[in-house]
């Protein structure tokens, strides 16, 4: 039992504050950890006060508290979950990134005694977002997990099985640089608050090719297929291409892996086929199909 007024009187004020906002406050054990959640405008919920006693770091309590607050927010109809974290707390950044949060929006200064500056992290419950360079960097580890899962399931996306974690992470770090340079538009898709899919729009920069763009690394985690993420990602990429003035889209895909049927259903047409284009983990050579779509 915890005597709030005697042992932690500040908790009563915190609990009253979040209740007044229509939210909730949870504590664990003898105040070994705590978390709060409160609604914002527009269907978003904010996760606040995520604290775990240092002696329990790595024990899983932080994950349990965060998931408890997220479940409550989703049960209340949240469409997005946001939080703020000190720019100096790299361990916290990785923790949130492992739970599919990405950097989103500008930083904020609190003008407090510690001169705190905070990053804003967010994730939609469902849907697709375009990631800027900061968002891409914060998503690298989760995107690496998605890439490895797709490669392990047989996807033909330039890598052989098994794909080492460090190679997958190195690939996405390179993509972050290209996003920052404006060469690539990167999109991520969430389902039930989990970052589970991605696609890239590669913008051709040659003077004679500025009307073209290429769809690349179209990936949906095997555990999340059949939920419409593929269509949502392509919708976002094609809309962005049109906004950028690109009228011709190109891609290549392995015939018979399912993605080619999705593209055909969406109005893509086959422009050519190259036999023996890839040699994969089983030692066999496979064809690739070049497809195009005019916007």
Task: Give the residues covered by each predicted segment.
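Acetyl-CoA-dependent GNAT
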Residues: 1-49, 53-54, 66-68, 72, ...
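Conserved GNAT acetyl-CoA-binding A-motif
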Residues: 66, 72-85, 234, 241-254
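Loop/helix-junction capping segments adjacent to catalytic residues or to phosphate/diphosphate-binding pockets
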Residues: 59, 90, 137, 209, ...
């Amino acid at each position: 039992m915890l005597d709030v007024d005697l042992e932690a009187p500040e908790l009563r004020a915190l609990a009253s504050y979040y209740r007044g906002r229509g939210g909730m406050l949870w504590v664990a054990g003898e105040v070994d950890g705590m978390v709060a959640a409160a609604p914002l405008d527009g269907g978003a919920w904010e996760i606040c006060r995520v604290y775990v006693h240092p002696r329990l770091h790595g024990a899983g309590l932080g994950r349990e508290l965060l998931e408890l607050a997220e479940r409550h927010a989703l049960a209340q109809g949240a469409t997005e979950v946001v939080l703020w974290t000190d720019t100096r707390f790299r361990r916290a950044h990785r923790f949130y990134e492992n739970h599919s949060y990405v950097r989103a929006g500008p930083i904020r200064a609190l003008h407090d005694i510690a001169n705190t500056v905070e990053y804003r992290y967010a994730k939609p419950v469902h849907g697709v977002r375009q990631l800027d360079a900061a968002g891409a960097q914060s998503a690298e580890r989760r995107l690496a997990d998605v890439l490895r899962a797709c490669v392990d399931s047989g996807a033909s996306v330039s890598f052989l099985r098994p794909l080492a974690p460090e190679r997958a992470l190195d690939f996405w770090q390179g993509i972050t640089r290209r996003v920052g340079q404006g060469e690539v538009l990167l999109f991520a898709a969430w389902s039930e608050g989990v970052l589970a899919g991605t696609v890239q729009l590669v913008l051709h920069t040659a003077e004679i090719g500025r009307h073209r763009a290429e769809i690349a690394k179209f990936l949906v985690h095997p555990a999340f297929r059949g939920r419409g993420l593929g269509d949502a990602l392509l919708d976002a990429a094609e809309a962005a291409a049109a906004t950028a003035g690109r009228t011709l889209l190109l891609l290549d895909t392995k015939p018979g892996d399912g993605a080619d049927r999705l593209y055909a259903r969406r109005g893509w047409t086959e422009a050519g086929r190259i036999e023996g284009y890839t040699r994969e983990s089983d030692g066999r050579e496979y064809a690739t199909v070049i497809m195009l779509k005019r916007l």
